[in-house]
A protein has these predicted regions:
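Conserved SAM/SAH cofactor-binding pocket of Class I
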Residues: 107-160
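N-terminal accessory targeting/assembly segments
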Residues: 1-4
């Protein structure tokens, strides 16, 4: 597994039994993950979750908040800032497992000021923001969801 030391404020505490337990800044979130098919390694940690996502049998799901969390907060990658906000579909707006890919993107672009990037299905703009931070001439962000495009603009603005 590739891992990036450049993502700050996020780490995986434990995973297993089709769930993952993650630290997102000051908060611990418990979310479903169908790929975590092994047994939990640290069962004593799971009760420490500040929020738990429960799947609905009819699709989607809901968050159970064990303590009051803000609607949004921030995590950092290198010197960039990204918004985190639990959504109705278990997501948080950032896929931290992509940080190794962000490292790759930055490393490939940092010495190419004439480069141009087209980021399709770009979600909340983490990769777009990383590409722009490499100092290239143009980055185009495309996502079908207007809400995600707005979220990407917010991440861009947080990182400038």
């Amino acid at each position: 597994m590739l891992y990036s030391e450049n993502i700050k404020d996020y780490y995986l505490l434990d995973a297993g039994d089709c769930e993952k337990l993650e630290v997102w800044g000051p908060y611990i979130l418990r979310r479903p993950d169908p790929m975590a098919i092994w047994k939990k390694q640290k069962p004593e940690l799971w009760d420490k979750a500040d929020a738990i996502y429960h799947r609905s049998k009819t699709g989607g799901g809901y968050w159970e908040f064990k303590k009051k969390l803000p609607e949004k907060w921030h995590i950092h990658y290198k010197d960039l800032t990204f918004k985190v906000s639990p959504t109705n579909f278990k997501h948080t707006g950032i896929f931290p497992e992509q940080a190794a890919n962000w490292d790759f993107i930055y490393d490939k672009l940092k010495d190419r000021p004439d480069a141009k990037v087209l980021n399709l299905f770009a979600y909340s703009g983490a990769a777009t923001t990383v590409a722009a931070s490499a100092g290239i001439s143009e980055v185009v962000h495309v996502d079908a969801s207007k809400g995600m495009v707005e979220w990407a603009k917010e991440n861009r603005d947080l990182s400038n």
